[in-house]
Amino acid sequence: MPAKLNSPSRYHGIYNAPHRAFLRSVGLTDEEIGKPLVAIATAWSEAGPCNFHALALARVAKEGTKEAGLSPLAFPTMVVNDNIGMGSEGMRYSLVSRDLIADMVEAQFNAHAFDGLVGIGGCDKTTPGILMAMARLNVPSIYIYGGSAEPGYFMGKRLTIEDVHEAIGAYLAKRITENELYEIEKRAHPTLGTCSGLFTANTMGSMSEALGMALPGSASPTATSSRRVMYVKETGKALGSLIENGIKSREILTFEAFENAITTLMAMGGSTNAVLHLLAIAYEAGVKLTLDDFNRISKRTPYIASMKPGGDYVMADLDEVGGVPVVLKKLLDAGLLHGDVLTVTGKTMKQNLEQYKYPNVPHSHIVRDVKNPIKPRGGIVILKGSLAPEGAVIKVAATNVVKFEGKAKVYNSEDDAFKGVQSGEVSEGEVVIIRYEGPKGAPGMPEMLRVTAAIMGAGLNNVALVTDGRFSGATRGPMVGHVAPEAMVGGPIAIVEDGDTIVIDVESERLDLKLSEEEIRNRLKRWSPPSPRYKSGLLAKYASLVSQASMGAVTRPA
C-alpha cells in the first residue's frame, strides 16, 4: 500500500496557494508540486574532508529521486569534524552534534511536510544522527554513506589518520624526527572522504547496511570512486519504491535488525562508539536495546574481519573483495543473522545477499570464515563491576590483553592526562584514570585519542586506560571507556585515588576497583560534585538533558 503523503495537506488546494508560490520561486512546476515531495538531508561542511563532497552527492541523489517520479528539495545539517576537534574544547561538541543533527532533520522534515527522506552522511556523528531522525520520524527513508578516503603511504607503509596521532607520541619520545612526523602528516589522508580504517565513520556506514537502511554494498566504495556516485543515484531512485510500497523506517529498524547490526559490529571489530549510537537509534525507533544484548551477541559472534586499527586493512581493501555484504553473507550462512528482516530494497536481508554480485577474488586475507576466526569472540565486550555498575566498553579487537591489574594514576581531565603522559608521569603497569569527561561532566563525552595515541606512540605498551569519556575508532590497546555512572553524577570512578588497584578482566566481563564495599560507600559519602564547566550555552543545555552512556547518551526532555 502506498505511503500516506504529508505534502498534499500543505501544498494542494486553494488555501495553500501561498505555500505553492514559494515552491514556484525555487523552480518547481505544477507537475512537480503534484508529485511526492521528498527531502535530501545532507551533512555538508567544508571544515574537513569527510563531508566536503556531500553537497555534490545531494545533487546526484536529487537526480535519482526525480527519475523515480519524486520532487526533491535538499537541505544541509551541521557537521562537527571529530579529527579537527580532537584534544580540544571542540571535541565536546562532537557527540552533542549527533543529537542536534537528529533534531535538525526532524525539524526540517516536519516543518516543510515532506513525504520521504534521503540521508547523506560521512563523519562520525552524521550517520547515527540522520538514522536517529529517520527512526524518530518513521517515514519512508533511506541512507547513503559518503565514503572513506583512500589510504596514504610513507616509506612503503600504508597510513591512516591514526598514524599521525601516534606519530606525535613517537616524536615526543624521540623515536622519530620532526621531519618524519611532517611527512606522515602530509601523506596520511590524501583524498576527500572519511578516515580510511574501520574507525567510527566506516563502522557506522557499515551499520547502515547491517540495519537494512542502506543499499547492499553502498558503505565500502571510497568517496573518490565512480561507484560511490552510482550508489547515491540508486539510493534516490530506491526512495520512490519505499514510498510506493508504504515502507517506513520502523518496519526496517526492528529488534532483529539491531541484533544483525550488533552481530556485524562484533564480527568486524568496529568502533566502540557504535555501542552508543545503536542504543540511541534503537531508542528513537522505540526498540528496547540494552548493553546486555551486546554481550550476549558478542559471546556467540567470532571476530573475522582484519580491519584497522585492530587488523591490517582499510575500507578500500574491503570494497575490492565485495564490501560489507561479504561479512554479512558469512554471518548469514553461519546462522548468526536474521535473514528474514525487511530492508530498504523492499526485499529481505537474505534475498539481498543471495542476489548481490560478489567479485570473484580471494578475500580470506581480509574476511575469514566463521569457523576460522581471528578471535572466537566478538570485537567488543561490555564490562561491569564495582568501578562500572552500569557498564563500560572495551574493544578487544584492538588488544590482546584479556586481564590487566595495575595501580591507578588519576586525572580529572583529558588535558591533565595528556600532560602527564608527555612529562613521563605514567609508568608501565599503571592504569590511567581520566574522569569528569562523561556525557554530563565534560560535557559531551569527548574522545581520548590524543592520550591513547600518546601512550602508544611513547612505547608504553603495558599501560591501560579507564575513562567515563569515549574513544576514537582509531584507538588501540587495553582502553576501557563509557564508564557508567560517570564521575559527574557520583559514579565510583569519581572516588578512585592514586595507587588504588584496578582490575580489568575481559573473560569475566568485569571492571573492578579493589576496595571493600564499605570503603567505596564511605568515599562516595565524602564525595561532592565539582562545579559544572559550563553554566550557559549549548553545552550547558546538553548536560541538563543527556542520559548516561549505558543508555546511549541520548538527550531526553527534562
Curated annotation (Swiss-Prot):
GO terms for MF: 2 iron, 2 sulfur cluster binding; dihydroxy-acid dehydratase activity; magnesium ion binding
InterPro entries noted in UniProt: DHAD_IlvD/Edd, Dihydro-acid_dehy_C, DihydroxyA_deHydtase, DiOHA_6PGluconate_deHydtase_CS, ILV_EDD_C, ILV_EDD_N, IlvD/EDD_N
UniProt pathway: Amino-acid biosynthesis; L-isoleucine biosynthesis; L-isoleucine from 2-oxobutanoate: step 3/4; Amino-acid biosynthesis; L-valine biosynthesis; L-valine from pyruvate: step 3/4
Catalysed transformations (reactions): (2R)-2,3-dihydroxy-3-methylbutanoate = 3-methyl-2-oxobutanoate + H2O; (2R,3R)-2,3-dihydroxy-3-methylpentanoate = (S)-3-methyl-2-oxopentanoate + H2O
Superkingdom of the organism of origin: Archaea
Cofactor: [2Fe-2S] cluster; Mg(2+)
Cofactor comment text: Binds 1 [2Fe-2S] cluster per subunit. This cluster acts as a Lewis acid cofactor.
Sorted UniProt keywords: 2Fe-2S, Amino-acid biosynthesis, Branched-chain amino acid biosynthesis, Iron, Iron-sulfur, Lyase, Magnesium, Metal-binding
Active site: 472
Pfam families named among the record's database cross-references: ILV_EDD_C, ILVD_EDD_N
One GO biological process term: isoleucine biosynthetic process
Chain ranges passing through the membrane: none
Ligand binding ([2Fe-2S] cluster): 50, 123, 195
SUPFAM superfamilies: IlvD/EDD N-terminal domain-like (SSF143975), LeuD/IlvD-like (SSF52016)
Residue list for modification N6-carboxylysine: 125
Assembly with partners or alone: Homodimer.
Similarity comment text for this entry: Belongs to the IlvD/Edd family.
UniProt-listed PANTHER family: DIHYDROXY-ACID DEHYDRATASE DAD, DIHYDROXY-ACID DEHYDRATASE, MITOCHONDRIAL
Function: Functions in the biosynthesis of branched-chain amino acids. Catalyzes the dehydration of (2R,3R)-2,3-dihydroxy-3-methylpentanoate (2,3-dihydroxy-3-methylvalerate) into 2-oxo-3-methylpentanoate (2-oxo-3-methylvalerate) and of (2R)-2,3-dihydroxy-3-methylbutanoate (2,3-dihydroxyisovalerate) into 2-oxo-3-methylbutanoate (2-oxoisovalerate), the penultimate precursor to L-isoleucine and L-valine, respectively.
HAMAP family: IlvD
Protein name: Dihydroxy-acid dehydratase
Gene name per UniProt: ilvD
